[in-house]
Amino acid sequence: MALLVGSTPGVSRKNFWINGEPYWKGIQLDEVAFPVMLAWRLHEADALQDFDPYPMVQQAAGYLMRHGPATPQERWEENSGYSPSTLASNIAALTCAACFARERGDVQSAEFVQQYADFLESHMESWTVTTEGTLFPDIRRHFIRIHPVATDNAYPDENPNNGTLLIRNRAPGQVAEFAAKDIVDAGFLELVRYGIRKAGDPLIEDSLRVVDSVLKVDTPCGPCWRRYNHDSYGQRADGGPFTGWGKGRAWPLVTGERGHYELAAGRDATPYLRALEGFASCSGLLPEQFWDESDRADLHLYFGKPTGSATPLLWAHAEYIKLLRSVTEGNVFDTIPAVADRYLHGRNHVSLEIWKANRRVRAAQSGTTLRIQVNAPFRLHWTVDEWQVVNDTASTATAFDIHFVDIALAASQKAPIRFTFFWLHEKRWEGTDYTVNIEHKSSYDSTKPNSSSSGRGHLPLVSEIRPPAVAMH
């Protein structure tokens, strides 16, 4: 299906007409990732029969690597930027794509894709965790809903303590812009769901305390949560219908997500399963939202029961079915073993910084690898010592319409890396010099791209296949 409805190679749209033409034009990078994860799960279950998903997998992986890491829309379809839930799906999908390539004997493609996934994983906290939280006493460091970044900004501010988030659907006259560091949701739980972070991780647990303090709704059926603070998509405060503005209510879907986390943490998830069942309508349908205030019998609105929101919400039903299976089997069904093996079991990964046209990183850490990654063949004209020695390196091609050059940064490197491009197909110079400054670990700003606290290696294996730099004077 993903092959049939993706008008842009590798992109799976949210919805489409019966002839396959996309209806909504917005792109969510998590929805590019999901078909890859599904394909791998079906492959592992030996359920693909004669269908070969690899062309779709290659296209989707290429799209994620060319257009990420900022997503045009996150899972709530409202904002662009660095989203913990979107990044989690991308890391998982790219790991699955690497597994597909490895099984086909394409070791170089597998290494390249996996290294991009590692790059995303190593930047997760520096992109999406504030250190200036104000929502819960004594918890300053926690995940935020999204760090807003415009996808057409080639020099984004990647400090999650900065940025203003526009909240959609606010009532006329209401404040609509808030500090992004003060807006939270539970999307970071996807990191645990897929096997990228451990349940019980102190940062995850602290972030949950913040979420519970501002989003949790306790009902006779069990706990539920609103999407994010200041959400305005839902039944109005007076009980009237949503007509372009309103008040975000509790979403049963999020109860299912929390149930999966509690199971992963070794706790009883049954109460969350029963809560979901209690939120259903009399006909057994799960709503998008339920009424989370005192009963309004005159409007047929009852605490803990469906509002006038979409019913059934298939997303919520899918979450319920997966939670039911997970509870029955005693483990989270959505966890991908290959992802967990990569990120939960102490394996060393590469320390990689990536410069590309849509993310022209300003600085890299000494002792790591700087990858120059673009979408056309090139020769890189570069120096590590202010042009005392000049290097010209031909880019390495990949199977994903991506070309790259790796520069190993010595631990003692101090001078900035300066470079420009000679475009091979067009036989022309770029005409612009670019600079990446070098920062050392002792002074490296944690709000800029860096490695996470897990162990890291140094040079990526794939860099060994690139042509050697040629020194020119």
Task: Give the role of each language-model region.
Residues 1-68, 84-87, 91-97, 313, ...:
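Aromatic-rich carbohydrate-recognition surfaces in CAZymes
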Residues 2-21, 85, 103, 110-253, ...:
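Extended ligand-binding clefts on enzyme/binding-domain cores
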Residues 10-25, 65-82, 165-173, 299-306:
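Acidic/His metal-coordination segments adjacent to aromatic residues that form catalytic metal sites
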Residues 14-17, 24-31, 35-38, 178-198, ...:
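C-terminal capping/lid segments that line or modulate ligand- or cofactor-binding pockets
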Residues 23-26, 51, 55, 77, ...:
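Short, solvent-exposed segments of well-ordered alpha helices
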Residues 42-58, 98-117, 195-209, 262-274, ...:
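Structural helix-adjacent loops and short alpha-helical linkers that scaffold large soluble proteins
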Residues 56-66, 89-103, 112-130, 210-213, ...:
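Alpha-helical scaffold segments in carbohydrate-active enzymes
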Residues 335-473:
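Glycan-association/targeting regions that enable binding to alpha-glucans and other polysaccharides
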